[in-house]
C-alpha cells in the first residue's frame, strides 16, 4: 500500500475511538505519532461529529499529515420498538449513506479551502455526479463506502459511468474541476 489512512474518528469503538478526532491537539498528537514511525504518506480521516472541522484539519496538517480524508460516519441511533432498547450494542454508532452527502460536501468544501494538503472526499457518495460534486467542492480524490454495502459493484459502476457523466457536464479532465465551486 502506498499510504496509511489513520481513522481518528470511529464512533463504533468504546474507549476513545472518536475522541482522538474531536479535538485539534489530540488529532495532531496522533498524526505526529504515526508520522514518527513511518515513511509512508499519512492521511488523517476526520469525524463530522465536531463543531469546527477546519481547526482539526489544520492541526493535522501542521503536525505533518500528508492529506486529510473526510467524512467518516455521523453519530446515529435507532431504538427497537418491541424491546424499547437501542438496536446498536453501543447504543449509538455510525450513520452513513446518501443522507450524509450534503454534510460531507460542505465539510470537504470548508477543509479544502483551509489546508494545502490533498483532501479526499467521502460520505454518502453513490454516483458519478457525487464524485464530480466532491471534486468541485475541493476533493482531489473520492472514496466510496456505504454504497458498496448496498451494491458490491457500486465503485466499478461509478467509475464506468464517469466518462458519460463528464461529457454531460462538459468536463474534459477531472483534475481541472478540483475546487471549481470555490
Go through each PLM region and give its residues:
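A short, charged, Gly/Pro-tolerant segment at domain boundaries
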Residues: 175-182
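Alpha/beta enzyme core
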Residues: 1-120, 126-144
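Small/polar glycine-rich anion-binding or flexible loop at a beta-alpha turn
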Residues: 125-129, 151, 182
Amino acid at each position: 500500500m502506498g499510504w496509511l489512512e489513520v481513522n481518528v474518528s470511529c464512533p463504533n469503538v468504546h474507549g476513545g475511538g472518536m475522541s482522538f478526532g474531536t479535538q485539534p491537539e489530540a488529532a495532531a498528537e496522533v498524526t505526529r505519532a504515526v508520522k514518527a514511525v513511518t515513511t509512508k504518506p499519512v492521511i488523517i480521516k476526520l469525524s463530522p461529529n465536531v463543531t469546527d472541522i477546519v481547526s482539526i484539519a489544520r492541526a493535522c496538517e501542521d503536525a505533518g499529515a500528508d492529506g486529510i480524508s473526510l467524512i467518516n460516519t455521523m453519530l446515529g441511533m435507532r431504538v427497537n420498538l418491541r424491546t424499547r432498547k437501542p438496536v446498536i450494542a453501543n447504543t449509538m454508532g455510525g450513520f452513513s449513506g446518501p443522507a450524509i452527502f450534503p454534510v460531507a460536501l460542505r465539510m470537504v468544501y470548508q477543509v479544502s479551502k483551509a489546508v494545502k494538503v490533498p483532501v479526499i472526499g467521502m460520505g454518502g457518495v453513490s454516483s458519478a455526479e457525487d464524485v464530480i460534486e466532491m471534486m468541485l467542492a475541493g476533493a482531489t480524490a473520492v472514496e466510496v463506502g456505504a454504497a458498496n454495502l448496498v451494491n458490491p459493484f457500486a465503485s466499478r459502476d461509478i467509475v464506468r459511468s464517469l466518462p458519460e457523466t463528464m461529457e454531460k457536464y462538459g468536463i474534459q479532465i477531472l483534475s481541472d474541476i478540483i475546487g471549481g465551486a470555490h
